[in-house]
């Protein structure tokens, strides 16, 4: 009987414990849920507090956020500006050096052109003097040879046609006529020497001719033309020495 009573008491305790757990479990769950949701409510309240503008003396205070300059962008802009300035300075230096080179090149070309023009002018003057001037040794030679070809005594001694040539070189080539220039009483004189021969075999003559500048006309007139023939014979083609003196 005592054992039955003890069993009843244990059963009653088990029932009481299970009922207590069933009653405490909803309360614990609700309490835990409240604890979990309470920070969210607090956060919402704080957010509402920060969002709501405050009123000071009837004016609504608003918060404005201004975004400052980005240091990276400022650094990039400064580097770009530095590179642009550097490029401009390099371009300026290159353009200056290029201008100096071009100026030096132009001066060099100008010097070369002037030198070429001076040489060309001197050559043209020499050619004109040799071909057309009355003081040219070649002109004097041509005129003297022409007078010898028409002179009767020269034709009879040498025969026709009479040919003229200059000094003989070592290689047997006939070079230009030899001439000498000198002045007498302020007047220029030119003396030439050349050789003639004709159809007569073994006949050769040496021609001596001299011209003097005419102060009135500026031309050169013959003073004399002599032809030396061996042995010790001279043919006077023209002699104006006494007339000019």
Curated annotation (Swiss-Prot):
Component of the TIM23 complex. Component of the MITRAC (mitochondrial translation regulation assembly intermediate of cytochrome c oxidase complex) complex, the core components of this complex being COA3/MITRAC12 and COX14. Interacts with COA3 and MT-CO1/COX1. The gene is Timm21. The chain crosses the membrane at residues 108-128. Residues 64-97 are annotated as: Disordered. Participates in the translocation of transit peptide-containing proteins across the mitochondrial inner membrane. Also required for assembly of mitochondrial respiratory chain complex I and complex IV as component of the MITRAC (mitochondrial translation regulation assembly intermediate of cytochrome c oxidase complex) complex. Probably shuttles between the presequence translocase and respiratory-chain assembly intermediates in a process that promotes incorporation of early nuclear-encoded subunits into these complexes. PANTHER family: MITOCHONDRIAL IMPORT INNER MEMBRANE TRANSLOCASE SUBUNIT TIM21 (PTHR13032:SF6). The keyword Methyltransferase does not apply. InterPro entries: Tim21 (IPR013261), Tim21_IMS_sf (IPR038552). GO terms for biological process: mitochondrial cytochrome c oxidase assembly; mitochondrial respiratory chain complex I assembly; protein import into mitochondrial matrix. It comes from Rattus norvegicus. Belongs to the TIM21 family. Residues 70-79 have a biased composition (Basic and acidic residues). Residues 1-18 form a transit peptide. It is found in: Mitochondrion membrane. Keywords: Membrane, Mitochondrion, Protein transport, Transit peptide, Translocation, Transmembrane, Transmembrane helix, Transport. This is Mitochondrial import inner membrane translocase subunit Tim21. Its main location: mitochondrion. The keyword Cell division does not apply. It is a single-pass membrane protein. GO terms for cellular component: TIM23 mitochondrial import inner membrane translocase complex. Signal peptide: none annotated.
């Amino acid at each position: 009987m005592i054992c039955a009573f003890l069993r009843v008491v244990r059963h009653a305790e088990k029932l009481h414990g299970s009922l207590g757990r069933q009653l405490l479990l909803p309360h614990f769950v609700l309490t835990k849920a409240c604890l979990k949701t309470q920070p969210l409510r607090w956060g919402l309240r704080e957010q509402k507090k920060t969002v709501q503008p405050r009123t000071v003396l009837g004016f609504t205070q608003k918060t404005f956020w201004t975004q400052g300059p980005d240091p990276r962008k400022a650094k990039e802009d400064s580097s770009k500006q530095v590179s642009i300035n550097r490029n401009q300075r390099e371009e300026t230096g290159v353009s200056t050096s290029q201008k100096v080179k071009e100026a030096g090149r132009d001066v060099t070309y100008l010097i070369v052109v002037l030198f070429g023009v001076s040489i060309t002018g001197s050559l043209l003057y020499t050619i004109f003097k040799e071909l057309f001037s009355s003081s040219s040794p070649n002109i004097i030679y041509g005129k003297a040879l022409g007078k010898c070809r028409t002179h009767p005594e020269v034709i009879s001694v040498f025969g026709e046609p009479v040919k003229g040539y200059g000094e003989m070189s070592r290689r047997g080539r006939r070079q230009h006529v030899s001439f000498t220039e000198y002045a007498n009483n302020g007047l220029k004189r030119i003396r030439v020497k050349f050789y003639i021969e004709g159809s007569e075999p073994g006949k050769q003559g040496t021609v001596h001719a001299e011209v003097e500048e005419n102060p009135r006309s500026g031309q050169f007139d013959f003073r004399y033309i002599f032809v030396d023939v061996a042995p010790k014979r001279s043919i006077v083609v023209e002699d104006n020495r006494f007339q000019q003196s």
